[in-house]
Amino acid sequence: MLRPLRDQILRISGYTVDSTLSVSEAMSMFAAKPYDLILIDVEGEHGIPEAEQLCSSVKTERNEQLVAFVCNWRVAILTDCPDDIVRTEFDPAAFVAGVKKILDKN
């Protein structure tokens, strides 16, 4: 339920967003066009292995691709694949600021 809301918040903030729940569809989308940033929503500790696999696949294909996990603080300390972490926020401005910070520093 939060993913569509986050997508819309990013769109309203001026970002172009492509979104999917499917790892295979995500890889197809990634192969079809370049992205400034790929956000992988990690839902709890149980989602880490799938998120890390997707991150690894993306980095294998294009090492320079920016990848960030959207997750809570606990998940953030359990993984090291992504370039950065955007903390799960109920504050839309903080979420957008996290995305902007990643893009600005790269």
Name the predicted role of every residue range.
Residues 1-18:
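Two-component/phosphorelay signaling modules centered on CheY-like receiver
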Residues 1-2, 43-47, 74-75, 92:
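Short acidic, S/G/P-rich loop/turn micro-motifs used as interaction or catalytic elements
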Residues 14, 35, 81-83:
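Short, well-ordered alpha-helix to beta-strand connector turns
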Residues 19-37, 45:
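Acidic, metal-coordinating helix/loop segments flanking the phosphotransfer/catalytic sites
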Residues 31-33, 57-64:
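Conserved phosphotransfer cores of two-component systems
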Residues 39-60:
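Conserved phosphotransfer microenvironments
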Residues 41, 66-72:
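Short beta-strand elements of ligand-binding domains
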Residues 71-106:
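Output/docking surface of receiver
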